[in-house]
Amino acid sequence: MSERTSLSRRRLLRATGLSSAAALAGCLGGGGGGSQRVPTDVGEWPPTEYNEELIVWNWYDDWASWAKGAFEKEHGVSVTTSGYSSPNQWYSKLQSGGAGIDNIAGTTNWVERSIENDFLHEIPVDLMPAWGNITDRIKEVSSYQKDGKTYGVPESLVLYPLTYNTDYFDAAPSSWDVLWSDEHRGKIVMWDNSTVSCQIAALYTGQDPIRPKDYAEIEEVLKQQKPLLKTYWGDYEQAQQLFVNEDVVAGPLTMGRTYTARFKEGAPVHYTAPKEGAMYTSDLFVIPKSAPNPIASLLFTDWASQPAVAAKLFETMGYKPAVDISDQLSERDLKFTTWSDDWNLVFQETLSDDVRSKYDEIWTAVKAA
């Protein structure tokens, strides 16, 4: 840990508190600095006793790199960040004990599994000043609570829209049927993801993407679509470059990647939610029960939910924060990040094991066709 020449008043108070608690921490076998305390032990804000280390797993890499320096500067905590490409990477760590992770940004369905398996600390959101910054849209749908207790704080809203080339189309495509049109043969793309692609097909055929009734129809239309496609994409950067290079003109791509393609690489692209609907979900900050520095993690979660900090998520990654940042954005970015009230948006609830299995079977059959 780097040496510092001065202590802020907050850190001085924290150091004083630690010295008075050292004997107790030693008796408990802890490492000091609040490692024996859990988030619900915090009785006032801000917490004055916490370790000076923090280990963060967050797949918004550019934001996490910025947050590391900013949080270290503001709170005197040494932050280690790690990215991940698939949620099962951190989930499997929690299954095996989860040692070494203090704060995770996880998707809703994996957070729900973690709650059910008692992997997460309860978070005292009523004590956190920044909790009031979280928008009602995501508070009302995100599955981060159980038995009246809160286990996650929403970080972002993730939309799975239809991205399209604005030079090719005179107006935003109004339907997912654009991905089944022979007119665009060889110019459209689909995500190599069983859940996303099957849910798009479910929406296209007028079904509930969470609880579909006609799996045969979903499989049939996906097989019909296959010869029309330029390719399936499996890597986010690959998909982004397909649009940047104008190899494709329409297909599913995340809002964040669409933003990057448009404003950082100059691609003529935008996104929309077709009339049949589009899926969206949330990523949430969670604190594992095995976290070595849970109080520092709680402090980080509140800090990250401040508008100025959350705005950096949009600025660096193009994703919509769970916090209202409208007063932090330029007119251009505000227009890009605003979702129309007319859109039919479907929250991505956790799929049942049966639906998930059926979607996997369908996708295997489609890819083999």
Regions picked out by a protein language model, each given a short descriptive name:
Residues 331-369:
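Extracellular/periplasmic bilobal clamshell ligand-binding domains
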Residues 38-113:
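Early extracytoplasmic/lumenal segment of secretory-pathway proteins
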Residues 1-20:
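N-terminal secretory signal peptides and thylakoid transit peptides that target proteins
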Residues 111-113, 251-268:
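A ligand-binding cleft/hinge motif common to bilobed small-molecule-binding domains
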